[in-house]
Curated annotation (Swiss-Prot):
Cofactor: binding comment: Binds 1 potassium ion per subunit.
Annotated binding of Mg(2+), by residue: S243, T264
Cofactor(s) it depends on: K(+)
Keyword hit for Magnesium: yes
Organism whose genome encodes this protein: Verminephrobacter eiseniae (strain EF01-2)
Name of the protein described by the UniProt record: tRNA modification GTPase MnmE
One GO term describing the cellular component: cytosol
Function: Exhibits a very high intrinsic GTPase hydrolysis rate. Involved in the addition of a carboxymethylaminomethyl (cmnm) group at the wobble position (U34) of certain tRNAs, forming tRNA-cmnm(5)s(2)U34.
Amino acid sequence: MRRHDPIVAIASAAGRGAIGIVRVSGNALGALAQALCGRALQPRMATYLAFRDARGQPIDQGLALYFPGPHSYTGEDVLELQAHGGPVVLQLLLARCLEAGAGADPATGRPCLPGLRLAQPGEFTERAFLNDKIDLAQAEAIADLIDASTEAAARSASRSLSGAFSAGIHGLCDALIALRTLVEASLDFPEEETDFLHQADARGQLSRLRQALGAVLQQARQGALLRDGIEVVIAGQPNAGKSSLLNALAGAELAIVTPVAGTTRDKVQQTIQIEGVPLRIIDTAGLRASDDEVERIGIARSWEAMAAADAVLFLHDLARAQTPKYIADDAEIERALARKLPPGVAVIDVWNKLDCVAAPAELAAPTAPTESAAVPPASARPAPAPRPAVQLSARTGQGLDGLRRILLEVAGWQSVPEGICIARARHVQALQMAAAHLEQAADQLQARGAALELLAEELRLAQNALDSITGAFTSDDLLGAIFARFCIGK
């Protein structure tokens, strides 16, 4: 399988629709277009015609569009056949393309398009990248635009697709190249009396570059949050109102709510958005000791979900909060949270059923008794940082806005002006790596003397990290992993 083979695929979504598209990309598609359409096509003009099989029998009627390269999506010749969006019709058109490609061109006697094959997922966009129609960040933005779950994510992906995010990276690279030029000049001409670095204020340039990179990194973190969101698990004792809270946050009756404890046996999840940030909210089985095998399986899955989450809403029932058994059971869950949750999982105490009590309670996490005498007394230990806490009523909606604010804070979301671009975790990692190398470069520049070679190397590594974002410096393995996630035909 070669990158220059002509390729064909159904480019529209699977299933039935008003319109379906079959797309072909390759070099010299004129003969194939003639065979498929029965006439020569005028470039970049839609032609209405009948699509016929090899025997001249009609398949469908629709539009044919021909885009000669390099002025096309892929940079190669592109042919699009737009027909009615029935799966059978599109499969017939796809088969006809493959058949016509292998068939003889009446003018030459050779195949119309030798080597025409089915495209791999993302191969059309990969060719656009390889032919310099878009860079790697823009290619990823196409997939992110298709997969966007919120309006904010879609608009941010569109800005990245337009090249706004890449422009910021290119600006950093340009400043970095200018700085590298000074360092290389100092290395290549050590006998010169001119101090290139001092004369050009290399320290000032590096400081400004680090500040600019920090700003791009902060925006990239926000862009990645818009794309990926966070996963939040609702946990607590049975009948604390977990399913009611899920329904309240989702604004729909997704989970069954009854007075019977243990109604939820398995995970129920829904994606919501708060200020454009997607949050996957998961309702789980109530945590308690149980002899019911099915319920025990559900509880085990609850703990698995919590361990994989970004945040856990530990739900407490204000109506039962003063009863000894409830206090003891909550404390047992608290001990299990401390034992089972990995570092980094935020726990938020949510006191539900505010509508069932006469006055708000004093917010505090359940006390988990120590299990070992070896644990130092509280007076000898530093006080733990207070956990976020909120009182609310899932039934009336009172306090939900406060919970939403806390969730955004836990996610790390900051209100940013219009113009944020979508980003991915790999972009954030690359920017962090570049920042680390620039920090090392600043240390070397401060030392000066024999450290110029190390300074030059740190700057080179920083540029490699930035170039990996746009694809100027990228391994084939990374390209394969990125484009394999695209749908076929894109």
